[in-house]
């Protein structure tokens, strides 16, 4: 049995294959997943697992250098936005690097997901609970 944090085989495999600047999406239950993208569906029921639960586990194994977030989260989900920014700040400190945060419209965000290595769907049912993580290097 794997001893590391990520026990889900699909998520572990995707993270291990990421190269510098490759992207990985963690999303809520409602984000449309492009047909061209690998879909890893973690949703069990509404809210389970939450967006933050999935993100926290993914970022224990993924080196992140940038994040893309929909601008709309600021006004439509300010509590999650604050939680997300706190997590990214803590991740920066843990990794010892600066994580660039980019905001874009939700429409452009959805288009950008087509270029990601995979889309990991959580059971989150709150608006704009989505992030595109850009892989960094550990050296």
UniProtKB/Swiss-Prot annotation:
Instruction: Respond yes or no to whether keyword Isomerase is given for this record.
Output: yes
* InterPro entries associated with the record: D-ribose_pyranase, RbsD-like_sf, RbsD_FucU
One annotated GO molecular function: intramolecular lyase activity
Might you give the EC number(s) for this enzyme? 5.4.99.62
Sorted alphabetically, the keyword list is: Carbohydrate metabolism, Cytoplasm, Isomerase
Pathway terms, separated by semicolons: Carbohydrate metabolism; D-ribose degradation; D-ribose 5-phosphate from beta-D-ribopyranose: step 1/2
Which BP terms does GO give this entry? D-ribose catabolic process
Kindly state which reaction or reactions the protein catalyses: beta-D-ribopyranose = beta-D-ribofuranose
A Pfam family of the record is RbsD_FucU
A GO CC annotation recorded here is: cytosol
Family named by the database record: Belongs to the RbsD / FucU family. RbsD subfamily.
Subunit field text = Homodecamer.
- The protein in question is named D-ribose pyranase
Source taxonomy lineage? Bacteria, Pseudomonadati, Pseudomonadota, Gammaproteobacteria, Enterobacterales
Name of the encoding gene? rbsD
């Amino acid at each position: 049995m794997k001893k590391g944090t990520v026990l889900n085989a699909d998520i572990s495999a995707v993270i291990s294959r990421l190269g510098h600047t490759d992207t990985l999406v963690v999303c809520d239950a409602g984000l449309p997943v492009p047909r061209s993208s690998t879909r890893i569906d973690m949703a069990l029921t509404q809210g389970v697992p939450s967006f933050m639960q999935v993100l926290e586990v993914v970022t224990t194994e993924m080196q992140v250098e940038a994040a893309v977030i929909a601008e709309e989260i600021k006004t439509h989900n300010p509590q999650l936005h604050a939680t997300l920014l706190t997590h990214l700040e803590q991740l920066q400190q843990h990794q010892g690097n600066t994580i660039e945060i980019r905001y874009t419209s939700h429409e452009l965000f959805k288009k950008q997901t087509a270029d990601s290595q995979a889309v990991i769907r959580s059971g989150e049912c709150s608006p704009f609970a989505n992030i595109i993580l850009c892989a960094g290097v550990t050296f």
